[in-house]
């Protein structure tokens, strides 16, 4: 969420940032809301100060035995007391109106982010050729269904569209990928493993900016009794472990010496994919439930840019060790996520589609999420308290890594060679094949 004080100090810069995202200027509207908030607070405080002053005058009038004046003053105090709840409610409503408007506005991009409208304007940052890009091959779902180890029909009977049942060695390969990634990030990249809850509160989803903007993309979980009565949801299934990991520092004041903090988690993720109708309808690319290793960093403002590059390198290391070809692109202003100041996407090569597809997204959010969470740190040597910066990235999406391994390591007979980095996690299995695997 944006700081209204910063907007007031430089409204033109704020509007320029919005324009880069294709949005109309909003500084004047926000400043007007803030003026209304200040006026409402001033009115409530002024009435309270007047009551306090009149109370002293009542005492003086009684001391002077001026009963008539004392009665008049007491009547005025009573009137002000009656008006106080309405004035306080008006001040509260004005503050909430400003906060609600600020909460609906996306983060503004860093100066170096390329201008653009959509994914076609993203800029390649670097690439890794790995084992080389095969120009043709079967898609993952063709390979999976041929082996009998990837069952979309069974999943549809259980849960509907956009789910999958993995079996045998293919299920083990997905598990191996997740464990491999966690081990890499915790032993080589300095991340602390966390096993977070998968159900979180409204305020936690608000903190990372999933709510209120992306409410329709989420799955709400509620007790059956509440659902039957038409009540409001009490918990949300996490769309990414970014949500609980980032909120570990909500409503806290850290010491500068604690930073940076680095967390990682392997969790299921749940997304309604409300805007994905007709896209990637076959296969595992776009699922309502998928597994992902998440990376989250909490830093000082001075550390966040360097940490962004470090996080990107950590995610890239997964694909390098798997020898998978990929490229990194810097997202343009029109393609960035709501909370992001700058985002790198890692796109892995999929021979079955003959194209690169996103497998990781690494973003720096500045203090945008920290303000929503009230997450701060105390600077050394008494230099005050400031909001932390937050970063998040996929390290990486396990289901899409499985797709990439299947398509890049496929053999002419339809079997899949297990990458050497995963063989220890597969109990020595080097090839996945056949309906009985």
From Swiss-Prot:
Name of this chain's protein: Serine--tRNA ligase
Gene Ontology biological process terms in this record: selenocysteine biosynthetic process; seryl-tRNA aminoacylation
Keywords, in A-Z order: Aminoacyl-tRNA synthetase, ATP-binding, Cytoplasm, Ligase, Nucleotide-binding, Protein biosynthesis
Leading EC class: ligase
Domain notes from UniProt: Consists of two distinct domains, a catalytic core and a N-terminal extension that is involved in tRNA binding.
Pfam families given in the database record: Seryl_tRNA_N, tRNA-synt_2b
Alphabetized GO MF terms: ATP binding; serine-tRNA ligase activity
Function: Catalyzes the attachment of serine to tRNA(Ser). Is also able to aminoacylate tRNA(Sec) with serine, to form the misacylated tRNA L-seryl-tRNA(Sec), which will be further converted into selenocysteinyl-tRNA(Sec).
Binding site for ATP: 271-273, 358-361
Compartments it resides in: Cytoplasm
Keyword Cytoplasm attached: yes
Gene Ontology CC entries for this record: cytoplasm
Organism this protein belongs to: Methylobacterium nodulans (strain LMG 21967 / CNCM I-2342 / ORS 2060)
